[in-house]
């Protein structure tokens, strides 16, 4: 495909000239290297002045501690403009006083590279659209331009067949003057010739294009990529890596002499997202996907997702954090899962006062009246008319489809009680003596599943699909088994 994006999982090198924005005539040769894992390194022949000096007197300077960092470094390489952002010198070698005079060298690390444009920084509104590809986006889209036909004769394969292409209409949704468009890009058939075989190929790539009403900056594009990445991570119930990110530059469309419109110039972004997508790895099993665009149409889902993610961002970040970077110790995961549940309950704005406000004020006044003046401030801070963690967990369990919850959590009250006890013991005592490791793991997985079901419920996932997920999804089935083994009250308590 023409204008192929630069994939974040593929390494690359760009040899060119590099300079600081304030000194465009002082250009240094060097090589920019990208390691295919999110790391960027610029090796210069020569060096930008990173030392910090204080002028003591005319012709007299004193070198201070620390070193300079550069927000932006510009470059040109392979007939493309390059902007490096967040640049820090990590090694400089100078030849002052050396026996053999040779060029200085310097190595600079950068957080982000824009290949194809010069911009003044992360806040520069230089882009009109972004296009994003994320792992397993094709599976979630539940559509393809490709189809296959196998010929048969009398019900027996006859050796004939065909792969055909039929373009798929793009799906779009507009949210607060921002257009999200789910589209396919495909190649026509081509051949890989080798000495031992010939392989015919066709490619279909799914991406989401985000177009803003007004020119936007890089930080807005990165947020759009994160929004898409989080959606696919939720849908696939696993860490979803960004495969590539391209930006369309403002004001670069042109009219050709024959009347055709030349598309806008594009720039590739190389950076380190939460997870780097592996473009050539095997797709996940379709049975692992919680929902697709067949179940929740793209046009309806995107407005809901933008709204839900906006109000439940903290809870979603914490619960997805258990997928992107699960801690090796169950205690960390316990705090993360329960914290996500608390943040979710607050974000949903469903909090109910345990005691009527007027009655609570009377009780509080009476209690504080019995406390000595010097301790009254401490007691005043601790007396609150807020739901407990147990109340919040019970409220969350009451929101999704109750048949799904019943299959997932055998005894909701016991789960809420044991989860509250475990979190409080860990947070306030530093240990959980009344819980085994297996029970803590069951609490983490069950609480995480309840949070996820709540988010899916907010997105409008039908009750039937919620039940199917609990019954059929491999990880949810395992969570159910753990809950039924560890989160049921002993017979003596029942």
Which residue stretches match the model-derived regions?
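Amphipathic, oligomerization/interface secondary-structure segments
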Residues: 46, 259-494
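Internal metal/ion-chelating core segments
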Residues: 202-295
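Short, charged N-terminal helix-start/capping segments
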Residues: 3-14, 22, 34-48, 52, ...
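Long, contiguous, compositionally biased segments that the model treats as domain-scale units
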Residues: 1-239, 469-472
């Amino acid at each position: 495909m023409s204008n192929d994006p630069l994939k974040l999982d593929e390494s690359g090198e760009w040899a060119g000239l590099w300079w600081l924005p304030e000194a465009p005539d002082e250009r240094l040769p060097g090589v920019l290297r990208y390691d295919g894992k999110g790391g960027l390194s610029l090796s210069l022949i020569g060096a930008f002045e990173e030392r910090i000096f204080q002028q003591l007197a005319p012709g007299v300077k004193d070198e201070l501690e620390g070193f300079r960092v550069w927000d932006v470094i510009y470059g040109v390489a392979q007939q493309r403009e390059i902007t490096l952002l967040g640049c820090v010198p990590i090694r400089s070698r100078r030849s002052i006083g050396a026996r053999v005079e040779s060029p200085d060298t310097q190595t600079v690390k950068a957080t982000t590279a824009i290949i194809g444009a010069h911009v003044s920084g992360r806040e520069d509104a230089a882009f009109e659209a972004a296009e994003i590809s994320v792992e397993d986006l094709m599976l979630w889209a539940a559509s393809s331009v490709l189809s296959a036909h196998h010929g048969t004769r009398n019900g027996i394969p006859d050796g004939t067949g065909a792969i055909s292409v039929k373009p798929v209409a793009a799906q779009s949704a507009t949210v607060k003057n921002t257009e999200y468009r789910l589209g396919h890009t495909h190649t026509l058939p081509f051949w890989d010739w080798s000495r031992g075989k010939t392989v015919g190929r066709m490619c279909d790539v799914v991406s989401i294009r985000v177009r803003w009403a007004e020119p936007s900056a890089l930080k807005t594009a990165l947020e759009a990529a994160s929004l898409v990445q989080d959606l696919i991570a939720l849908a696939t119930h696993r860490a979803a890596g960004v495969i590539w990110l391209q930006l369309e530059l403002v004001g670069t469309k042109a009219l050709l002499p024959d009347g055709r419109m030349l598309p806008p110039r594009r720039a590739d972004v190389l950076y380190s997202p939460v997870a780097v997508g592996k473009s050539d790895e095997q797709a996940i099993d379709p049975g692992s996907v919680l929902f697709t665009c067949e179940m929740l149409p793209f046009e309806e889902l995107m407005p809901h997702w933008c709204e839900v993610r906006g109000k439940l961002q903290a809870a979603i970040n914490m619960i997805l954090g258990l997928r992107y970077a699960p801690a090796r110790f169950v205690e960390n995961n316990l705090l993360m899962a329960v914290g996500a549940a608390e943040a979710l309950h607050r974000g949903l704005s469903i909090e109910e006062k345990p005691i009527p406000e007027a009655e609570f004020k009377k009780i509080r006044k009476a209690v504080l009246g019995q406390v000595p003046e010097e301790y009254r401030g401490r007691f005043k801070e601790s007396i609150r008319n807020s739901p407990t963690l147990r109340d919040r967990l019970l409220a969350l369990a009451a929101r999704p489809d109750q048949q799904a919850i019943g299959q997932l959590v055998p005894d909701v009250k016991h789960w809420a009680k044991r989860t509250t006890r475990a979190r409080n013991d860990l947070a306030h005592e530093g240990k959980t003596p009344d819980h085994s490791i297996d029970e803590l793991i069951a609490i983490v997985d069950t609480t995480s599943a309840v949070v996820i079901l709540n988010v899916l419920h907010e997105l409008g996932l039908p009750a039937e699909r919620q039940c199917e997920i609990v019954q059929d999804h491999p990880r949810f089935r395992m969570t159910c088994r753990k809950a039924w083994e560890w989160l049921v009250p002993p017979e003596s308590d029942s």
